[in-house]
Amino acid sequence: MNESILEKYGENLTQVKYLVNPAVARDKELKELVMVLLTPEKSAVLVGKPGIGKTAIVEGLAYRLQLGDIPNALRGYSVYKISTPSLVGNYDGENRVMALVNELKTKDKIILFIDEIHMLMGASSQGPMDLTNMFKEGLSRGTVKLIGATTVDEYERYILRDKAFVRRFEKIDISEPTQEMCVQILMRTVPKLESQTGVRLPYTDFIKENIMKFIVNMTSEYKRVYEISSRYPDIALVVLRQAFSAALYDNKNQVGFKHIYEAVKSTKAVYLDVIKKELVVFKEMFKDELEQEGVIVEIPE
């Protein structure tokens, strides 16, 4: 295969333009990840529930590489995120993965991020792939470093039984952010959403932070729809993004409280009785802003 697997199925995260640090409030996990990458012949696997920001931590690593805020031993490395489903698609997963392995033998200073790495463990038609053996040459030379990511359930189901993988890959537990951390994450996400949509959130930092606190509180654990099984920060980010979408739908270049209200009342992330209660809080918490903008909050029966 002559084409580059890295270029076709991967994304160079070190070439992405980051408006803000993608890994807000994740310094502890980032340090742990960097320490593993600095350990000879060791790779890392990030393990945590869906939607808690495992990919954001790897993006945070790429961001630090861009800034040069990284130990000298890792300077000059590129971080590639590879699309796992595309590697195992069309029943030729073995060919594509082997082509990737062979390509990496010719590369230097590559950090390969494989999300949903458990999918590759079962990609072979003749049983689980021995990923540690396949990447062994690059790992031994120290020129290729691997980061995997998976959920707690998939780690226990697929990975724990592969003793060679467990020896090579240091497990890094990624916890759900606290409410305070999630507020920080949402605040730092606003510039990115403004850039993506061309729509501004035009309030003072004090009002913005109160908006984020409200969104985070209304999507706290026991208020979430169980079947969605999403966590902080994703479940809160969904509501924030919906407010920006509502402004775009209205052909506005600013997010107003009308759009935040629409996002809150229409969210599928929390139960209907929660929405009713939270709208009462919303109406009182932002009373002055709602009156100023002429927004009437109706509480569903």
Q: In which residue ranges do the predicted regions lie?
A:
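AAA+ P-loop NTPase nucleotide-binding core of proteostasis motors
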Residues: M1-E301
